[in-house]
Amino acid sequence: MAEISPHARCLACAFPFWEQLTPEEQERLCRFTRPVHYAKGARVHSPLESCVGILLLRSGQLRSYLLSEDGRDVTLYRLFGGEVCILSASCVMDAVNIDLYIDAEEDTEALCISAGIFRQLMQENVYVRCYAYQMTAERFSDTMWTMQQILFMSADRRLAIFLTDELAKTGGTDLRMTHDQMAKYMGAAREVVSRMLKYFAQEGWVRLYRGGVQVLDKKKLQALARGE
């Protein structure tokens, strides 16, 4: 495959529909793709801003969340390098109407695809359209899982799920994260998270240290996460 632009290889790897595009569609997608950088803490998307576009993360981390009128937020999901943020271009999905906020949790490098061009490709190419709806369904599945935990699960089980999920990403036993960060990502009060961590430490499941947690008994946490 001849390289159409410096971004063609990244787009080809990220999007399963790439080979189903015509050469003209591939060229158009590349032409309206640009590199973007978001500093840690930067606002990427909000309901008050225009449609950002589809983001293909190359490095860093984005957090998607809802914000209440009194300033309380609930983290819905996080995205990491290699993942695609489609709800930053929710304007291309006529059936999606959600007041979503997206912030950069770390310095983030990404490729941004024009929302208008992506909408055109969705209308022209059934493979692009199917991909967009599949990705949107996956993000809403993540959102429903988060809401299910908040509404129906006990605090200790939610914390066990969070710890096991985070460690699964790294394959280690240490999680370098403050109690405030854990509470933010879980949609819980900091006091609740601190109390549960202290309980886990008393049981010998974790060791607490400044700025992090070391898991000592992963099997116990996994059993609690499963509701056993």
Residue ranges and their predicted role:
Residues 1-39, 89-92:
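Cyclic nucleotide-binding regulatory module and flanking cytosolic helices
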Residues 44-49:
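Short phosphate-coordinating micro-motif centered on Lys-Gly-acidic
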Residues 164-228:
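Phosphate-/nucleic-acid-contacting segments
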